[in-house]
Amino acid sequence: MEQTADQPVTGQVAEAMTAEHESLSLECRADPARFERLLAPDFHEFGASGGEIGYPGTAAQVAAATDPEGEPIRVENMRGWLLADGLVMLKYTSEIQGRRANRTSLWRRTASGRWQIFHHQGTITAR
């Protein structure tokens, strides 16, 4: 069942959305250790260039590209689906320094109950 930010979001979808928003906060992105805790060991991303990025070095790359005093990442139309117990897909549009992208993330709950992202894709879109 789809849950959106315009409606009451509950349960695991709400937990995954909280984790996604954390991963997008400048404070988290500027802190490699904090950001890395949100990444699953098998994390991979298809970036805007079409290249695939894996877990090693991702947190350091994100931190190096983040200005903690910069403009926050804007998020629009976030919605989520509980695919299975402990597995959530999120879709939304982001805007970073005037660049918009459609994004999809897959989040998995660990045995300890923490949420980690294991797949992300961002596709640049026209305004």
Each PLM stretch: what is its role?
Residues 73-76, 89, 99-104:
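Short, surface-exposed coil-to-beta transition loops
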Residues 1-7:
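Juxtamembrane and targeting peptides
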Residues 39, 94-96, 121-124:
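Short beta-strand segments enriched in hydrophobic/aromatic residues
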Residues 100-127:
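Short beta-strand edge/turn micro-motifs at domain boundaries
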Residues 87-88, 115:
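Hydrophobic residues embedded in beta-strands of well-ordered beta-sheets
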Residues 13-14, 26-86:
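A solvent-exposed, acidic/Ser-Thr-rich amphipathic alpha-helical stretch
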